């Protein structure tokens, strides 16, 4: 415990040089081991006492996929460390060895989908939001839940309201394929007392409302919003939009 009496005795114990590239890591610590996401989708397990590298896993990207983006978050569940890669794959690694236990495709990177946020764990489910939804496809950005043991997808919630569904009319008569943005750039959070997941979404795309054939008074749900989701089925319990039509 660091307090007023001992804070002046803190000193550098060791230093670890990370991979080159953009890096915004949030390391995990478990049983004295640091699990660190690096640029280039490299995961390292480091002894917390002396900084010794215990194991390293490097994601193999398909030809043409991005390779230098940042990963912001990892998740730990039982004996597994899980990561959502930049090219849209969920991977579970053995926490002791770094060996891949399973992998599951979240989205097709060829359509522009990517990932930077990383999963959280709730009741044995890995919950993750995707980004890279600017190219206009038949499916928008989304949040998914996967079985933490097997990788099976359990539910999927789209972050753009579809025509004919609640909030769908806030995009006017735009077909679903032209409703872009509302990406999930950072990891969500979970409130166990409320039993709710919370995720933030980005702005609509294209950025300028007139380019969408809309005005700034058109809400384009569920962009620029905080979403509260039921972790059991992914249903939107409530939402709050911070800026309308931005």
Language model regions located:
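Repeat-blade elements of multi-bladed beta-propeller folds
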Residues: 20-42, 65-90, 114-137, 143, ...
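Extracytoplasmic/lumenal domain signature
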Residues: 2-18, 43-65, 77, 89-110, ...
């Amino acid at each position: 415990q660091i307090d007023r009496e001992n804070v002046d005795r803190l000193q550098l114990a060791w230093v670890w040089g990370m991979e080159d590239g953009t890096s915004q890591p949030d390391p995990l610590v478990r049983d004295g081991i640091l699990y660190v996401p690096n640029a280039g989708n490299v995961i390292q397990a480091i002894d917390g006492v002396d900084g010794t590298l215990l194991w390293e896993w490097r994601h193999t990207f398909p030809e043409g996929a991005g390779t230098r983006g940042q990963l912001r978050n990892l998740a730990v569940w039982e004996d597994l460390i899980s990561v959502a890669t930049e090219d849209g794959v969920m991977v579970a690694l053995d926490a002791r060895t770094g060996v891949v236990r399973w992998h599951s495709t979240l989205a097709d990177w060829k359509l522009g989908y990517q990932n930077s946020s990383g999963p959280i764990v709730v009741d044995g489910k890995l919950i993750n939001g995707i980004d890279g939804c600017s190219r206009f496809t038949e499916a928008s950005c989304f949040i998914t839940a996967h079985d933490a043991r097997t990788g099976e997808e359990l539910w999927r919630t789209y972050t753009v309201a579809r025509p004919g569904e609640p909030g769908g009319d806030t995009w006017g008569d735009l077909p679903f394929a032209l409703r872009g943005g509302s990406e999930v750039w950072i990891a969500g959070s979970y409130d166990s007392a409320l039993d709710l997941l919370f995720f933030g979404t980005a702005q609509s795309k294209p950025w300028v409302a007139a380019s969408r054939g809309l005005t700034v008074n058109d809400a384009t749900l569920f962009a620029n919003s905080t979403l509260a989701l039921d972790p059991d089925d992914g249903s939107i319990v409530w939402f709050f939009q911070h800026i309308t039509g931005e």
